[in-house]
Swiss-Prot record:
Any one of the GO CC terms: plasma membrane
Name under which the protein is recorded: Cytochrome c oxidase subunit 1
GO MF, one annotated term: metal ion binding
EC number, UniProt record: 7.1.1.9
InterPro entries: Cyt_c_oxase-like_su1_dom, Cyt_c_oxase-like_su1_sf, Cyt_C_Oxase_1, Cyt_c_Oxase_su1_BS, Cyt_c_oxidase_su1_bac
Encoding gene (name): ctaD
Organism phylogeny: Bacteria, Bacillati, Bacillota, Bacilli, Bacillales
Catalyzed reactions: 4 Fe(II)-[cytochrome c] + O2 + 8 H(+)(in) = 4 Fe(III)-[cytochrome c] + 2 H2O + 4 H(+)(out)
Amino acid sequence: MATQKQEKSVIWDWLTTVDHKKIAIMYLIAGTLFFVKAGVMALFMRIQLMYPEMNFLSGQTFNEFITMHGTIMLFLAATPLLFAFMNYVIPLQIGARDVAFPFVNALGFWIFFFGGLLLSLSWFFGGGPDAGWTAYVPLSSRDYGGLGIDFYVLGLQVSGIGTLISAINFLVTIVNMRAPGMTMMRLPLFVWTSFISSTLILFAFTPLAAGLALLMLDRLFEAQYFIPSMGGNVVLWQHIFWIFGHPEVYILVLPAFGIISEVIPAFSRKRLFGYTAMVFATMIIAFLGFMVWAHHMFTVGMGPVANSIFAVATMTIAVPTGIKIFNWLFTMWGGKITFNTAMLFASSFVPTFVLGGVTGVMLAMAPVDYLYHDTYFVVAHFHYIIVGGIVLSLFAGLFYWYPKMFGHMLNETLGKLFFWVFYIGFHLTFFVQHLLGLMGMPRRVYTYLGDQGLDAFNFISTIGTFFMSAGVILLVINVIYSAFKGERVTVADPWDARTLEWATPTPVPEYNFAQTPQVRSLDPLFYEKIHGDGTMKPAEPVTDIHMPNGSILPFIMSIGLFFAGFGLIMLNMDNPIINPWIVAIGGLALTFGCMFVRSIKEDHGYHIPAEQVKADLAELKKGGN
């Protein structure tokens, strides 16, 4: 028999929650903190490059910043921020009461978070990793890489476990938890792209985990996988890394495409043009994304045949991506467009991403890549993809879903000011870096001489970074201001949108839907507005709702993995104050002990009685939500 829900303090409630909505907000906060941290590093690096031969940062500090900036932005900022929206929105969009495995959802967050903390601890033990975010061997070997590389390896290994189990959870949720009538071809595009992105995580993070394990064995136990003098192969690391690294771009950009595919139809007052083509284009992009990893290695010496095959495969990705671009444009064509902040970010994404794609096709030409490789042209290209593609989409999604997540609107005036300051700053920063690359400025250098003609463009690029920073500060001000003065949202659907999450009350109750909705079409809420009375028809009567109990075990298990990783890092420390094996084995014992407790403990959750659900429904009807 299920127990009654226990009353908890606020902190205990958040530490033990398995509610997908609260976990989403924790992902949002953690991802934002890491985003700001990596952004400050970027600002410091641009200040160092503002003038020739600056001494704002030393070469060593610059190397550490450039490594941590890339690593944090991809693993600990972009990924969790997308996971925040995936966690909050997917169950609501498919008509589910939670994800398939709420306990695993909480575990995925806490493992990611403590993995990020483990990586960040490197600053207190001699400095961060300094081999670049790709950690190419031999730069990351024991001979050249300091203790920071051990934090990189173990921090990403722990964090990656959290990402992997969360992806499995999303896959099972989307396959098994859909409301009656919601076939796969009625899924919102955001759910489709998240589903395909989670599949990519499944296949991309496993080689990363294997590669990090081999590098760990090289560094901690003197294995020889990547040491040429002992029969190892440094190019092997490059292949292992990039067969993860290139799909990682699509792991991030596909859910971003999904956000754009939700925002543009909502504010164009039209259904998404070419839904079926968009679904299959997403599948093709994901498939081809695994076929092109070696285009990062054109200058390694794979030979003309391999280079040619990967060059052609890379250019082919432009075709399904082009389909998506035109479908977004056709969605806006003839629509009654509302240019609020979310729509400004979504529509500006399109030309920005196209420019990033065009430079991508240029880089795909293997002979020309010999000129571009390791120059600022490449830096400009991938920032147009990651900032112009992923970050603009995240901001669009934030302004779009913020009322549903927090119960109040963000200020539109501050929002539009944020958009223009950030967007102008972005192009100022990165457009001129194409030109710096064509002029021959190499990546990852901490200074340059005054007679090389690079002064003006570097100065402009740094000014742009100040604009971007000012934009992010405006966003923070907006969030704080709106929390106190923002317009409160009391209706379910402030945007007159099309999908199921806008059929839930605001704020969303812990059980999401009092009655599981019956889905009759793609864009189910819009269908009911046209063919019904504007409300979703229930697929079941009002009954007791079963809910999972919260648990502190995910938090404790993650602490155990944190200490296990730290204990292994201590093996490379000089004179550790405690035997590293005690820390490592103790951490693993804590994690496996929690797994054992979880296995033998009977926990059937609790029920929300039908009477309470009916009372909630009556209250909502009275309030007009």
